[in-house]
Amino acid sequence: MRMAAQYEMLTQLAKAGTKLDFGQDLFVKFYQAFIASNRWQQYLKGVIPTLYVTAIALTIGVVLGSVVALVRVAHDQQRRGHHDPALAVANAVCKLYATVIRGTPMMVQMLIMSMVIFANSRNFTMVGALALGINSGAYVSEIIRGGLMAVDPGQMEAGRSLGLNYITTMALIVIPQAIRSVLPALGNEFIVLLKDTSLITVIGGKELLYAA
């Protein structure tokens, strides 16, 4: 009630021609944007879709990024003289994906997804989440790849010398050690995704900026 009374007083002063100072003017604008007519409820309606889109995009990014990272690491760690043609092709595709996605603007990718690939879809929020997830996957792949490559190569050699195959050694020895160095960077990626959700407003998706 005190805020409402103060707002009414300041608006009356402004209408009378009194120049408000910076703090008073800021208070009036804040009240109009968030408090008047319970507008904060509208913002709250935008927060839930924003978190929903972020969660979906991060899930897609982590899954896609993990696959790309594992393929590239497996290719780089092949023994000399043992080159798998299928793995070489998969590595080339993964490298092309990471290079193209990281080298093109997020906005362009969003527009291509909504106006070309899913031109007939009207679920703009999900299309935006998918575009964000594919974009995130390229960055997550480099994060995970860096974490895996940072583990001492002797760990892989030790596992193989004990009779474990490549997959078991990666799952039980290498990956658990890489997680510690990967988690902080993944936290940063989550923050970036949370901010990038504002881009889906361009294609008609609903989130916090759309609600605002």
Ranges and model annotations:
Residues R2-A212:
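Transmembrane alpha-helices and adjacent helix-loop boundaries
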